[in-house]
Curated annotation (Swiss-Prot):
Keywords from the UniProt entry: Aminoacyl-tRNA synthetase, ATP-binding, Cytoplasm, Ligase, Metal-binding, Nucleotide-binding, Protein biosynthesis, RNA-binding, tRNA-binding, Zinc
Record-listed Zn(2+) binding positions: 577, 581, 680, 684
UniProt name for this protein: Alanine--tRNA ligase
Record CDD domains: AlaRS_core (cd00673)
Chain's gene name: alaS
InterPro entries: aa-tRNA-synth_II/BPL/LPL (IPR045864), Ala-tRNA-lgiase_IIc (IPR002318), Ala-tRNA-ligase_IIc_anticod-bd (IPR018162), Ala-tRNA-synth_IIc_core (IPR018165), Ala-tRNA-synth_IIc_N (IPR018164), Ala-tRNA_ligase (IPR050058), Ala_tRNA_ligase_euk/bac (IPR023033), Thr/Ala-tRNA-synth_IIc_edit (IPR018163)
Length: 926
């Protein structure tokens, strides 16, 4: 059975063999100003369809897998996500295109060949739709497509009249807009009913048992402004097939061997690792339940399963959008991202998870999709940081906002009204950052509605109030600054504009703006005998250096000021930046030329360097890399920079470029000696001797095929060592509290030279490692002895418990209160019980400030009852959480609960199971 990467690649290979140029996915940020996001596979090729550009490939055929996002504007699937098996905000669209080259014959034949011969779709389960217009609809019956399909089904010994269905403009005519290129389309559907005998009766009926998998669009007409349609001089093919849907069909039917269950995109390898990670985080089990109808009353497990699907969907959308340079904000695309993130956090609360937690799900996503989308690997750290910081930002106001919502709810109940006023919704938005759709989601859960018109009126008023300052900011960000900071650290300048939040742009500046992994400069603005601290420097979209100041006071546009960069800080940053170039060179020397930079952080305190490599580096490799860097530092080689046109240098193999970076027309080439050349806009030392001693502090993996080295040099290294020495002392204190007999660490002497400090630091690390190992061994022996005692005790308790078995219907059941035993004791006890009797056991104990709960179900009883289902109902009654499998499940509850009440509730639930044979989900008890 193929996984998602194999399915995607086989599609691309299939069309490559048929003369198509394979293109990487375009960005989620579209070229068109009319689109929020790239939301369809054809978006990047609109200029070809419109005739504004000629397809540059010979033959003019393209295939790709395009990233798409639908979460705002006209194409918006947000509200459907989670409530069914196939709607997503982010998805991949597999597509092949012909620009005035092949047409219907090849497009249909190749689609049939890929599906039935390459992928093995059962021919008898495939149905095709063909355009047949109703009166007053454009164009004519697509007889050409009909005849092609007729012959294919006839050749497959299938009845074409059963397998070809006709559709009107609604389903089988594609238009780019009110005017412009358009044409009929032919959809391919697959019958997923158990017997495969639906005869196409479920086509376009929103049934999960008959799914559209591929749409073949034949662009042959032009919609004119007068409402008429005319033939285009050139004809094109545009096809689209959702990767998630294909994976669901192939994997959900075990390569077409099983059709006895509803397939789901979320049961594929694109989503399963994310769901498993979320189960680990939340300690809640995902069961895959789906509401049978949109208005179905949701029970607790359905709500949780919907939450799982919403969260894993939104994490995918967030990660890919951030990788393409979109950041959460209050405007445009950024606002959509912020809404997605806050919705995901709200659904996380249904699982009992509080932020930050979404960022933890980026790593499994990178492992799933990073091989095809390297931008995920390159930007993983950035994606995690953005999501985590945004989660923390919202977490600070979430609880207050929810408290206000609760007040609103109680007030509404008292006033017997069902609609949240526009003012109440606006306060939640304006004060606590709740997007309108989040308030609507909360309202929906309570059976309320929201006065959206009133909300929009208040929003419009707020926009009018802020319009002046907003326009000022937007206009000002068209300004540019002259950067003089390569040569100067102080400069006279004039204030060009003051922005909100104490930000300022000057006509010229020595302050480096954060870019390319290097942090922005700090320092001072001297004005009117006052020093104003510069807290950070960033770059605007127009290239202006935006300085964030502690205050602006009397500053105004036109003010003459004196700018001073923090020289010590800048020198540390410059040393670390040049050190990254030396490190890059040394890595390629030791590991091979295929080793390339995949990201970096250059700050005053240390450097971080991500690079492509499989597997950890050996101690010998790290030592050699460190030796090579320090060797070049000792040689005091010159560091020079020159500007050149990008066109002239872009194909020069001797000049390294950062993968995925977009360069301007003019670039800066930084050379170290005669051995290192890189495109780089950062600040550097004048010669390598200024770097000082270089030390690798750590090496570890950050994602599949990407390793990270952290290092420091010179004065920053010395400060790091002193700080770490204090941490070593703290660590020793913790270990000493566990074992007072531990000897003291080697003494730290602040006044020693750097080489001696490094030597003592390493010796102390070795001592701590030895102490830790010794204590771990003792704890391991202690734990082993405790487990042996527990096993003996569990065996004795299990023997005695057999006499306490009670029958509930046909089910033998044990309820055991294990007093103050830890959670680890309960599975040992179940193991002993299950050796002796096939039963259902509900075990509980009270320890570490909570109730531990364990449920075991004997293998012969799982057809009647599953442990995870029983647990989910039990913990839901007491606001606990947990998860598990068919045979075992465990969870935790508040310490205030009486175990006898817990058992009584369990008994009531089991009575429902015991009385109904073969039932896997009993009716809820009161």
């Amino acid at each position: 059975m193929m996984n998602s990467n194999e399915i995607r690649q086989s599609f691309l290979d299939f069309f490559k063999e048929r003369g198509h140029t394979i293109l990487p996915s375009a960005s989620l940020v579209p070229e068109s100003p009319n689109l929020l996001f790239t939301n369809a596979g054809m978006n990047p090729f609109v200029p070809f369809f419109l005739g504004k550009q000629k397809c540059p490939y010979v033959p003019p055929r393209i295939a790709d897998s395009q990233k798409c996002l639908r979460a705002g504007g006209k194409h918006n699937d947000l509200e459907e996500v989670g409530y069914d098996t196939y709607h997503h905000t982010f998805f991949e669209m597999l597509g092949n295109w012909s620009f005035n080259d092949y047409f219907k014959e090849e497009a249909i034949h190749w689609a049939w060949e890929l599906l039935t011969q390459k992928w093995g779709f059962p021919k008898e389960r495939i149905y095709a739709t063909v355009y047949k217009p109703a009166p007053d609809e454009p164009g004519e019956f697509d007889e050409e497509a009909f005849r092609i399909w007729f012959k294919l089904f006839q050749k497959a010994k299938l009845n074409p009249l059963l397998h070809i269905h006709f559709g009107t403009k609604k389903d089988n005519f594609w238009m780019m807009g009110e005017t412009g290129p358009c044409g009929p389309c032919s959809e391919i559907h697959i019958d997923l009913t158990p017997d495969g005998q639906s005869e196409g009766k479920l086509i376009n009926k929103n049934s999960p048992l008959c799914i559209e998998i591929w749409n073949l669009v034949f662009i042959q007409l032009n919609a004119n402004e007068d409402g008429s349609f005319s033939l285009l001089p050139s004809r094109h093919v545009d096809t689209g097939m959702g990767l998630e849907r294909v994976c669901a069909i192939i994997q959900g039917t075990s390569s077409f061997r099983q059709f006895n269950r509803t397939i789901s995109d979320y049961d594929t390898d694109l989503f399963i690792p994310l769901i498993e990670k979320l189960q680990d985080i939340s300690k809640v089990s995902y069961t895959g339940s789906i509401p049978p109808t949109p208005d179905f009353a949701l029970d607790p497990q359905l709500k949780k399963d919907i939450a799982f699907r919403v969260i894993v969907d939104h994490v995918r959308a967030l990660a890919f959008a951030i990788a393409d340079g979109i950041l959460p904000s209050n405007l445009g695309r950024g606002h959509v991202l912020r809404r997605l993130l806050r919705r995901a956090i709200r659904f996380g609360q249904i699982l009992g998870v509080n932020p930050p937690f979404l960022f933890e799900m980026v790593d499994p996503l990178v492992k799933i999709m990073g091989s095809h989308y390297p931008e995920l690997i390159d930007k993983q750290g950035h994606i995690e940081e953005v999501i985590s910081s945004e989660e923390e930002l919202f977490a600070r106001t979430l609880s207050h906002g929810l408290a206000l919502f609760e007040e609103i709810k109680q007030k509404m109940i008292a006033e017997k009204r069902k609609e949240i006023s526009g003012k109440e919704a606006f306060v939640l938005y304006d004060t606590y950052g709740f997007p309108l759709d989040l308030t609507q989601l909360l309202a929906k859960e309570q059976g309320f509605s929201v006065d959206t018109q009133g909300f929009e009126r208040l929003m419009a008023e707020q926009r009018r109030r802020s319009l002046l300052s907003h326009e000022e900011d937007i206009v000002s960000l068209t300004k540019t600054s002259q950067f003089v900071g390569y040569e100067e650290l102080e400069a006279e300048a004039e204030v060009v504009v003051l922005l909100s939040a104490n930000r300022a742009i000057f006509d010229r500046t020595p302050f480096y703006a954060e870019m390319g992994g290097q942090v922005g400069d700090k320092g001072y603005v001297v004005f009117d005998q006052k020093k104003i601290e510069v807290l950070d420097t960033m770059k605007s979209a127009s290239g202006a250096h935006v300085h964030r100041l502690a205050f602006t006071d009397d500053l105004k546009p036109g003010s003459r000021v004196y700018l001073q960069v923090d020289e010590k800080r800048r020198r540390c940053i410059a040393a670390h930046h040049t050190a990254t170039h030396l490190l890059h060179w040394a890595l390629r020397k030791v590991l091979g030329p295929e080793t390339l930079q995949r990201g970096s952080y250059v700050g005053p305190d240390r450097l971080r360097f991500d690079f492509s490599h499989t597997g950890p580096l050996s101690a010998e490799e790290l030592a050699e890399i460190e030796r090579l860097v320090n060797e070049k530092i000792e040689l005091n080689d010159p560091v020079t920079a020159e500007e050149e046109s990008y066109e002239k240098v872009k194909n020069n193999p001797d000049i390294l470029q950062l993968f995925g970076e977009k360069y301007g027309q003019r670039v800066r080439i930084v050379s170290v000696g005669r051995y290192s050349k890189e495109l780089c806009g950062g600040t550097h030392v004048r010669s390598t001797g200024e770097i000082g001693y270089f030390k690798i502090l750590g090496e570890y993996g950050v994602s599949a095929g990407i390793r990270r080295i952290e290092a420091a040099c010179g004065k920053a290294l010395e400060q790091f060592l002193h700080a770490q020495a204090a941490e070593q002392d703290k660590k020793w204190q913790i270990l000493h509290s566990k074992d007072p007999s531990l000897p003291r660490l080697s003494k730290w002497v602040d006044t020693l030279d750097l080489d001696s400090l490094i030597e003592i630091f390493q010796r102390r690390n070795e001592e701590l490692s030895s102490f830790e190992k010794e204590i771990k061994e003792r704890e391991k022996l202690r734990a082993k002895k405790q487990e042996e005692n527990f096993r003996r005790e569990a065996s004795q308790q299990a023997m005695a418990a057999i006499a306490q078995v009670e029958k509930i219907g046909a089910i033998p059941v044990l309820f055991l209160d294990c007093d103050a035993k830890p959670q680890s004791y309960l599975p040992l006890l179940w193991n002993e019980i299950s050796k002796r009797i096939d039963s259902v056991a509900i075990l509980a104990s009270r320890s570490e400030g909570k109730i531990n709960l364990f449920i075991g179900v004997g293998p012969s009883l799982t057809t009647k009852i599953e442990a995870r289902n029983l647990l989910s109902q039990l913990v839901a009654s007491f606001e606990g959480k947990g998860g598990g499998s068919k045979t075992i499940a465990q969870g935790g509850l508040k310490d205030s609960i009486e175990i006898s009440s817990l058992f009584e509730k369990g008994r009531g639930i089991l009575e429902q199971y015991g009385g109904q044979k073969g039932q896997t989900e009993p009716k809820a008890t009161g």
